[in-house]
Amino acid sequence: METQLSNGPTCNNTANGPTTVNNNCSSPVDSGNTEDSKTNLIDNYLPQNMTQEELKSLFGSIGEIESCKLVRDKITGQSLGYGFVNYIDPKDAEKAINTLNGLRLQTKTIKVSYARPSSASIRDANLYVSGLPKTMTQKELEQLFSQYGRIITSRILVDQVTGISRGVGFIRFDKRIEAEEAIKGLNGQKPPGATEPITVKFANNPSQKTNQAILSQLYQSPNRRYPGPLAQQAQRFRLDNLLNMAYGVKRFSPMTIDGMTSLAGINIPGHPGTGWCIFVYNLAPDADESILWQMFGPFGAVTNVKVIRDFNTNKCKGFGFVTMTNYDEAAMAIASLNGYRLGDRVLQVSFKTNKTHKA
């Protein structure tokens, strides 16, 4: 779904990963009227449960604050793990950096630095990376991408139960041009330890603002159903827990979905050897790849998406395909999204078979 990201925190790189990665970040507030503002601070790696009041109280202990903003997800309201504090006196801002930078709060080591003014060169520099080797560490991910520019934050998504990598990561560069170079250099390449090429793409697409309302509905709509053989009384999951594992987001509708044991041992023809191919039917004419990336991303590593378009009109013909690397994640995505109402259409989602529509 990882993912429509807006520009996030701008700080020096640290070994401590970001507190969260999300598809619908608010853009950072402007750091002031001048490029050399010495009163506005950006505060990174804040504890996930820290409130704006607590942020204000912490920094207010240093000096008088003009404004304070904890940046939250536009859809869920969840903290994105960073914020901005603007002091009245530049000396207080300097003191806050000297006092609070490196402070250990819960499991996080916060980073406090001067904020930069917002500009086109530093916006939209977030990358979504899929197909990573499960053994790759966050440090190795940064080493792979650091040759293209300064990395602001990085993260590899892991299963919170097993701690095993989900094969998906995010890299936020200092500048968009650096992210563009990383895409040119690494997309479709095999990093050390990988058996398949990785996919590197922008995690955000500013032109897809019209999709946010639809995707918000996907996250929050209580109108869900789970037809077909998946609806067995097997191990039960909660959709909000699933997405919490993927992105740390908890404010999803508490719909239950049934487990995958009913699919165990079944020989499904949707596996071509390079991933599990999923057929998505009844898409709207204006549907594009962005919708599919953002719908399926939180369930696991997505290596490819394709919307089938009419040759003459370039409009979606009503169906598309998604390829995921892991069977369990693909099956969970099908269980969650089959029968989902997207806009005024009910989606049909299944493993691709020999009888499935052809491109």
From Swiss-Prot:
Record keywords, A-Z: Phosphoprotein, Repeat, RNA-binding
Modified-residue entries (Phosphoserine), positions: S221
Domain RRM intervals: 39-117, 125-205, 276-354
Cellular component terms (Gene Ontology): cerebellar granule cell to Purkinje cell synapse; ribonucleoprotein complex; synapse
SUPFAM superfamilies, A to Z: RNA-binding domain, RBD
Annotated GO biological process: cellular response to leukemia inhibitory factor; regulation of synapse assembly
One MF term in the entry's GO annotations: RNA binding
PROSITE patterns tied to this protein: RRM
Pfam families: RRM_1
Subunit record text: Interacts with IGF2BP1. Interacts with MAP1B light chain LC1.
Record-given protein name: ELAV-like protein 2
The encoding gene: Elavl2
